């Protein structure tokens, strides 16, 4: 019968027991979450009810309660109110699930209801089990095992256990394993595993003890029946107001006492199900039980297979958990029992007290000793001592740690071992995680019977719980056979981590097991590699990851993203594991591969290195060092290391590495990486000139370009080693500078096509070398990242006798019509005209850089088509030598740069194509070719010849659409196509970086990596220069020819106005413009044909212009280089002597000159023959020769830089005034050249400090000019973050910047990167800084360095004057000795006091120039007073005589008084005679006086008045005061102790009393214009006009 209804009123205080029906209601609310079987919960609970497994140690009563609860869920008594039906169904089911050994006996008893059946079973248990610790285990094991098999999770916490239990089928306990017929649960992903317990064997085992329990069975039966009847009676006493609800509540309350505890213990083990994990609570904690250690909890609460049918195991695990807490569990159980039937009378309780006490004792025993005990034996049969002994012997660590002692120090039993190694491990892990020691200890040692035998491996077990765990292990093994995996919740993962040696994951191939899925995954790699080895095609990319493992990974870690190896398709959870794995594919045979590759390269006569993308890929996957220094052969893993290394060679001699191979390295782009990924597949593509095979036409075109470069250098013994990369067109162009070869057979046109598949006629070797002695014409098409289709635009180029010019395009769809316009200059001729297709700042949407080059005569055309795909690179003008020169120099290069338009227009053929031949060929002049080649062999220096300029016209092209093969994603900015959207995304970032600055050079070279900043010209080209350069056209002979729209034409029109006398004719129509230069304009050196951007006409880069020097006609791409070059002409001493008959045009960007540096030294010094990679180097070098002549006396020949700075600096001064943008700044003291004024300032600080040192030490110190530059260069290698606003120099930290800023405080000008020593002509002073005046001649200077230079001239003059004066003094010495003494005595007696002021007025200047002379003079002056009275007077008169000399004799130069003290120090008598010859007797007397002073020198001990300024001594205060006034007048124009001033000899004392008398012969000359002035003030005013 059902329990009484009123019991629910006694249970509300059990807060720890949740409402089970409510929990089950949750299950009904979300049935799919838990069972996945649809909305029919009734059927679900029916299956749970039928499949509940009986677990012996749970006890029959608890099993009954569970069955009743499941039946309620199944039959739903709220709709079916027949309690009898429920009771009968429960009884029927109960009889079905009881152990087989008990069925005959129970059926013989014929129980009428469930209560009687329970009584029978309880009596049976008591008869055959001891009362001590092990009392309830054996029977409970059998019963509970079956209960588990037949239960399924109906309610909240126990939902999982019950549901899982019922999966194994209802009849597993009654039928043999092979006859189980229950259907597989829809949620189950594994086959219906047979985990039933061979209870028949156990029946015999328990029947041996049945007699011992008979005595208690009947009594217990009667008491239980009576107690249950009382419960029923109490239930009937309740009001029938809501019978169904009350019944359900009663069942829930009853179940909550026991069933909840069972379910709580393991419901959290199925954490994969959210509803169960939410409802589950740790019962031992919630009910006040002693909490067991977390490690032990995890071991038995985890590792349950999702589809495991042995649900009874879950109940076993919780019972073990509960039984751990001994005393609290007992107390709780007793209180639960008392609360379970609270309304029973005391008599009833006493009546059933024996039974209840026994069950409580049994409950306490298995609760307290479940982990340490086995079977429950009656104390009459087995002593406690024996039980404890069994505990010690059979207990083992549930954590799987292998410890040999439990918490109380008892020795522990090792886990059972299964047949195979895998099963051993699985058994250990299973037993440790899912079983408790009670199962392993449950068999007494003295029992020989092993009733439970495993059908899989034949192992026998005496304890059913161990047998259950063992079968679960087999279940897990079978999971792998069907490709299923466990639900690896966090708890399961922790179990696996905590188990040592417990291996659960088995390899299908070899059967090896692992305790972690990651270990299994790593193990599978071995098989995967073996599979790959067996594959014939090593490139096979077939996935080899077995699906079970892959799904296992997903289920274990719950991730959707894995790292997959592209070679073998193996997946990894971490990128680091993938990297390690990929080393296997690429690391083993790397040496052999490299050696084999080099052998192949040597066979075909060139070193062909893969592109940097492949290098990066190889580096990523363990390749050896891929960056090799071609100077010393050292290899590096990173390009940055190579760059740093190559600086060592560069610092030693930046010009000794000429001819070295290019080692330019790049950071590969994504598209290139994708292309390089297929590079190794070696998809063949024929090439006419080489023996190489290429995967794509782009590779072929790349290789063809390399062949062109190779052939260009064959005649000179160069063999090019190129790290070629599609996107990096800058590098390619840098190595395609066509050099004429000295051998005749090599001097042929060489034409390259970018795609062999197109209709463009690719010249064969015969065609290429058919031409005669002329320099080859290289049409270099920079390959795109992906294969581009190209074809001839203007028709096939037929090789002619003169030259061959092949036009090629990247367009694969539209033939473009190209037209050429010619600019011819009759006075000159360019044998070389290079068209550079310059990418616009905003990449054009059309990528058809087809340009035609045509030379009228003596010219050769070369077309450089920029990389149409790499729009981010601004391709600057390369030094492309052009033959021809002006009358005073050889200028070979006509750089024609074409900027693509953003919206190109179709070019209309017909107009302005006078030079274009009918057959699409170009006429290439043949004269002077041999001479040009000779000159080119000498690196760009050509003899004077008539100039005939070949004008190339960049035409607008039709709208292009790129659809290369395999390209699907097109860039809207530039039209480049990509096979992958990710590549397009990466590519579009390039345009984003371009927009702020117009264009950016992303170029990496051996010297440095250029940061993505505004591309500078050689040193400092800036925005202002870009805007104002067009206004300077007249000065710099700049010419433009554009092919753009009206805006561009208007710009050309403005230029035409500014160049009227130079007659730059421009024919502009809507779509094309032809620039025609009139013949006869010999000054027109460099026609710069500039295709500007239609959308952004304001972004004309000065890099597209060529500036011409008016003095020599030399052309420069860089305005700063022209400014720097013009300073050479400003040196008068070099104008006539220097043979500047050679000219160079150098690239305008750092990246260009870097490429030059990496192997192509094109600039040669005509004096010494030294070659340079950059024209700026040549300029600097030429200054050495100039300085050799100018500063030969000082031997200063340091004048060129060894390295360029790491980063180009912003030239703010050039932005303000481009005319002042000097490429180098010179130190006027030592001639040292600098790139930035900050370096010059730092260098000048050394000079200033040295000047102070000279003043203090009285000696000149040698200055090493290169120290500052070396330090500057070293500092440039560091990353600069803080920039100086004055000069643009950057510093690593703000402290250095603060120190640097102080340098500019004392500077008269705003020193910028382009400041030169002549900048004061146009730039105003920063502030009112005093002029520096020369004491010798009175000239004023703005800067102390100029004054220092000026004083050096005085020193030379003084030396000459001293030599002449010494000769004159020797002749007059005799006469001076006769006349001077008498005159001196007379003068001393009369003019002592009057002469002192004037004497002292002259002496300060003397002493300022020569302090050492005056150091001796005071002694002579002061000696007189202590000796004879007349002598001091005479001595005082002597200076007076000197001072009066200018007054008395106006013809006497003022410098006479200056030189006299020095001569007196050397030869007093001689010096005395020198002035006497030109002066009167008083003057001579004054000169003679020092000699007499020296005679009385020993009589003076100390002076009366000592001047601290000049250390002069005076005998009277009046003379001393007058002397001080002189010092005050001397510092009007000269700041005291000014840096950079040097003491020198004063020949003319401008402030002396004789200054006015000397005015006629005294002048002041302006250093700028040479104008003379009578006084310094006029000179200062005049100089202000120069400075503004």
Curated annotation (Swiss-Prot):
PROSITE patterns: SCAN_BOX, ZINC_FINGER_C2H2_1, ZINC_FINGER_C2H2_2
Free-text note regarding domains: The SCAN domain enables PEG3 homo- or heterodimerization to control gene expression in a combinatorial fashion.
InterPro entries referenced in this protein's UniProt entry, alphabetically: Krueppel_C2H2_ZnFinger, SCAN_dom, SCAN_sf, Znf_C2H2_sf, Znf_C2H2_type
Oligomer status and interactors: Homodimer. Interacts with SIAH1A and SIAH2. Interacts with TRAF2.
Keywords: Apoptosis, Cytoplasm, Metal-binding, Nucleus, Repeat, Zinc, Zinc-finger
Gene: PEG3
Main location class: nucleus
SUPFAM superfamilies: beta-beta-alpha zinc fingers (SSF57667), Retrovirus capsid dimerization domain-like (SSF47353)
Region Disordered: start-end pairs: 128-231, 265-304, 317-347, 588-608, 839-889, 905-929, 1056-1104, 1396-1495
Chain positions covered by the region annotation 3 X 7 AA repeat of P-E-V-E-A-A-E: 1397-1417
GO CC, one annotated term: nucleus
Family: Belongs to the krueppel C2H2-type zinc-finger protein family.
Annotated compartments: Nucleus; Cytoplasm
UniProt biased composition (Acidic residues): 129-142, 1396-1415, 1449-1466, 1475-1495
Protein's UniProt name: Paternally-expressed gene 3 protein
Ranges of compositional bias, category Basic and acidic residues: 143-152, 160-181, 205-224, 293-304, 588-607, 868-881, 1071-1082
Natural source organism: Homo sapiens
């Amino acid at each position: 019968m059902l329990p009484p209804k009123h019991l629910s009123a006694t249970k509300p205080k059990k807060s720890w027991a949740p409402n089970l029906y409510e929990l089950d209601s949750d299950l009904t609310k979300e049935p799919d979450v838990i069972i996945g079987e649809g909305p029919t919960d009734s059927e679900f609970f029916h299956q749970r009810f039928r499949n509940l497994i009986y677990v012996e140690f749970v006890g029959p009563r608890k099993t009954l309660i569970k069955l009743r609860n499941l039946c309620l869920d199944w039959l739903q008594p709220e709709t079916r109110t027949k309690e009898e039906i429920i009771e009968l169904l429960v009884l029927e089911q109960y009889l079905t699930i009881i152990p087989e050994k008990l069925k005959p006996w129970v059926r013989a008893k014929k129980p009428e209801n469930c209560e009687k059946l329970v009584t029978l079973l309880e009596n049976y248990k008591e008869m055959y089990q001891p009362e001590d610790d092990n009392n309830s285990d054996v029977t409970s094991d059998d019963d509970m095992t079956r209960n588990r098999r037949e239960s399924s999770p109906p309610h909240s916490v126990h939902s999982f256990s019950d549901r899982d239990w019922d999966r194994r089928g209802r009849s597993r306990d009654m039928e043999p394993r092979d006859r189980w017929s229950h259907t597989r649960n829809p949620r189950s992903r594994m086959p219906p595993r047979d985990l039933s317990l061979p209870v028949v064997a156990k029946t015999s085992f328990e029947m041996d003890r049945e007699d011992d329990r008979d005595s208690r069975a009947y009594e217990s039966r009667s008491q239980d029946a009576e107690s249950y009847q009382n419960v029923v009676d109490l239930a009937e006493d309740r009001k029938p107001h809501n019978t169904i609800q009350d019944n359900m509540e009663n069942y829930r309350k009853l179940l909550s006492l026991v069933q909840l505890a069972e379910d709580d213990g393991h419901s959290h083990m199925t954490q994969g199900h959210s509803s169960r994990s939410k409802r589950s609570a740790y019962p031992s904690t919630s009910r006040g039980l002693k909490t067991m250690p977390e490690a032990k909890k995890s071991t038995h609460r985890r590792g349950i297979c999702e589809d495991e049918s042995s649900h009874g195991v879950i109940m076993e695990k919780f019972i073990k958990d509960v039984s751990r807490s001994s005393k609290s569990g007992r107390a709780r159980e007793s209180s639960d029992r008392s609360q379970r039937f609270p309304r029973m009378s005391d008599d009833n309780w006493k009546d059933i007290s024996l039974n209840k006490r026994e069950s409580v004792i049994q409950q306490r025993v298995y609760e307290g000793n479940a982990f340490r005990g086995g079977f429950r034996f009656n104390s009459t049969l087995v002593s406690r001592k024996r039980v404890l002994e069994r505990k010690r012997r059979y207990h083992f660590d549930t954590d799987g740690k292998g410890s040999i002692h439990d918490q109380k120090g008892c020795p522990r039993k090792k886990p059972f071992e299964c047949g195979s190694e895998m099963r051993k491990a699985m058994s250990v892990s299973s037993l440790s995680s899912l079983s408790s020691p009670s199962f392993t200890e449950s068999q007494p040692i003295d029992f020989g019977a092993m009733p439970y035998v495993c059908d899989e491996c034949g192992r026998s077990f005496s304890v059913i719980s161990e047998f259950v765990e063992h079968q679960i292990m087999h279940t897990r093994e079978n999971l792998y056979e069907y490709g299923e995996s466990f639900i690896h919740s966090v708890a399961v993962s922790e179990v696996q981590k905590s188990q040592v040696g417990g291996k659960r994951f088995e390899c299908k191939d070899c059967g090896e097991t692992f305790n972690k899925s990651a270990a299994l995954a790593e193990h599978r790699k071995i098989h995967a590699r073996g599979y790959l080895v067996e594959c014939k095609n090593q490139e096979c990319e077939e996935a080899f990851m077995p699906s079970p493992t892959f799904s296992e990974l997903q289920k274990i870690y719950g991730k959707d993203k894995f790292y997959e190896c592209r070679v073998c398709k193996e997946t990894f959870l971490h990128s680091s594991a993938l990297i390690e794995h990929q080393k296997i594919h690429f690391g083993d045979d790397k040496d052999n591969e490299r050696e084999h590759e080099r052998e192949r390269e040597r066979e075909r006569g060139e070193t062909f290195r893969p592109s940097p993308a492949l290098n990066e890929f190889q580096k990523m996957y363990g390749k050896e060092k891929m960056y090799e220094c071609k100077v010393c052969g050292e290899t590096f893993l990173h390009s940055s290391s190579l760059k740093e290394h190559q600086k060592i060679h560069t610092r030693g001699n930046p010009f000794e590495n000429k001819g070295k191979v290019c080692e330019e390295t790049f950071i590969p782009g994504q598209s290139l990486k994708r292309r390089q990924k297929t590079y190794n597949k070696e998809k063949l593509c024929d090439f006419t000139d080489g023996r190489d095979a290429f995967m794509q036409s782009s590779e072929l075109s790349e290789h063809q370009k390399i062949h062109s470069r190779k052939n260009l250098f064959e005649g000179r013994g160069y063999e090019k080693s190129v790290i070629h990369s599609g996107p990096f067109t800058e590098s390619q162009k840098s190595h395609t500078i066509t050099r004429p070869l000295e051998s005749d057979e090599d001097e042929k046109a060489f034409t390259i096509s970018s795609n062999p598949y197109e209709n463009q006629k690719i010249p064969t070797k015969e065609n290429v070398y058919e031409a005669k002695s002329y320099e080859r014409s290289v049409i270099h098409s920079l390959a795109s990242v992906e294969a581009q289709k190209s074809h001839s635009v203007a028709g096939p180029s037929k090789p002619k006798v003169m030259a061959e010019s092949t036009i090629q395009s990247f367009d694969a769809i539209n033939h473009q019509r190209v037209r050429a316009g010619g600019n011819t200059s009759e006075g000159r001729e360019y044998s070389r005209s290079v068209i550079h297709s310059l990418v616009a700042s905003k990449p054009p949407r059309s990528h058809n850089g087809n340009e035609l080059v045509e030379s009228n005569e003596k010219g050769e055309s070369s077309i450089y088509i920029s990389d149409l795909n790499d729009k981010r690179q601004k391709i600057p003008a390369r030094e492309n030598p052009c033959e021809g020169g002006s009358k005073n120099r050889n200028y070979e290069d006509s750089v024609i740069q074409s900027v693509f338009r953003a919206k190109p227009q179709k070019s209309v053929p017909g107009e302005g194509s006078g030079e274009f031949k009918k057959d699409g060929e170009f006429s290439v002049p043949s004269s002077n070719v041999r001479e040009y080649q000779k000159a080119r062999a000498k690196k760009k220096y050509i003899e004077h010849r008539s100039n005939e300029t070949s004008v190339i016209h960049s035409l607008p092209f039709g709208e292009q659409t790129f659809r290369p093969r395999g390209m699907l994603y097109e860039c809207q900015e530039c039209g480049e196509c990509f096979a992958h959207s990710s590549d397009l995304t990466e590519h579009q970032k390039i345009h984003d970086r371009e927009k702020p600055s117009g264009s950016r050079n992303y170029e990496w070279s051996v010297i440095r990596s250029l940061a993505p900043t505004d591309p500078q010209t050689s040193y400092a080209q800036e925005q202002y220069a870009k805007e104002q350069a067009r206004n300077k056209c007249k000065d710099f002979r700049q010419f433009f020819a554009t092919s753009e729209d009206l805006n561009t034409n208007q710009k050309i029109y403005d230029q035409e106005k500014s160049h009227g006398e130079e007659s730059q004719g421009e024919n502009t129509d809507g779509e094309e413009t032809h620039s025609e230069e009139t013949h006869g304009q010999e000054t027109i050196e460099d026609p710069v044909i500039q295709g500007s951007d239609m959308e952004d006409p304001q972004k004309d880069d000065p890099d597209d212009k060529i500036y011409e020097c008016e003095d020599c006609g030399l052309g420069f791409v860089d305005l700063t280089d022209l400014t720097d070059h013009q300073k050479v002409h400003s040196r008068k001493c070099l104008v006539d002597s220097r043979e500047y008959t050679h000219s160079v045009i150098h690239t305008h960007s750092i990246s260009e000159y870097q490429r030059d540096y990496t192997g192509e030294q094109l600039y040669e010094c005509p004096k010494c023959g030294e070659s340079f990679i950059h024209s700026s180097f040549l300029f600097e070098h030429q200054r050495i020769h100039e300085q050799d002549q100018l500063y030969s006396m000082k031997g200063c020949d340091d004048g060129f830089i060894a390295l360029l700075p790491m980063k180009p600096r912003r030239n703010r001064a050039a932005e303000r005034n481009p005319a002042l943008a000097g490429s180098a700044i010179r130190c006027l003291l030592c001639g040292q050249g600098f790139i930035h004024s900050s370096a010059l300032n730092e260098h000048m600080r050394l000079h200033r400090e040295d000047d102070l040192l000279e003043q203090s030490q009285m000696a000149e110190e040698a200055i090493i000019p290169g120290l500052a530059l070396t330090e500057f260069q070293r500092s440039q290698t560091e990353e600069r973050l803080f920039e100086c606003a004055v000069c643009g120099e950057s510093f690593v930290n703000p402290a250095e910047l603060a120190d640097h800023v102080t340098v500019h405080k004392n500077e008269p000008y705003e020193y910028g990167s382009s400041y030169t020593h002549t900048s004061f002509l146009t730039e105003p002073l920063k502030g009112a800084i005093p002029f520096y005046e020369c004491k010798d001649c009175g000239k004023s200077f703005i800067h102390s360095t100029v004054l220092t230079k000026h004083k050096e001239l005085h020193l030379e003059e003084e030396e000459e004057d001293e030599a002449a004066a010494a000769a004159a003094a020797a002749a007059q010495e005799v006469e001076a000795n006769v006349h001077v003494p008498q005159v001196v005595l007379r003068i001393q007696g009369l003019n002592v006091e009057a002469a002192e002021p004037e004497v002292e007025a002259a002496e300060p200047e003397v002493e300022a120039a020569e302090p050492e002379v005056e150091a001796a003079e005071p002694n002579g002056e002061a000696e007189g007073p202590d000796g004879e009275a007349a002598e001091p007077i005479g001595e005082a008169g002597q200076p007076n005589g000197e001072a009066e000399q200018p007054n008395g004799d106006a013809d006497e130069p003022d410098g006479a008084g200056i030189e006299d003290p020095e001569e007196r120090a050397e030869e007093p008598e001689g010096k005395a005679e020198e002035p006497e010859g030109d002066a009167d007797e008083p003057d001579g007397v004054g000169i003679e006086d020092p000699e007499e002073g020296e005679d009385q020198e020993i009589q003076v001990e100390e002076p009366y008045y000592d001047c601290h300024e000049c250390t002069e001594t005076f005998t009277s205060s009046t003379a001393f005061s007058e002397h001080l006034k002189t010092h005050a007048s001397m510092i009007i124009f000269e700041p005291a102790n000014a840096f950079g001033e040097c003491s020198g000899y004063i020949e003319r004392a401008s402030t002396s009393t004789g200054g006015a008398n000397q005015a006629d012969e005294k002048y002041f000359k302006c250093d700028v214009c040479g104008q003379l002035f009578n006084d310094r003030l006029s000179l200062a005013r005049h100089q202000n006009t120069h400075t503004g």
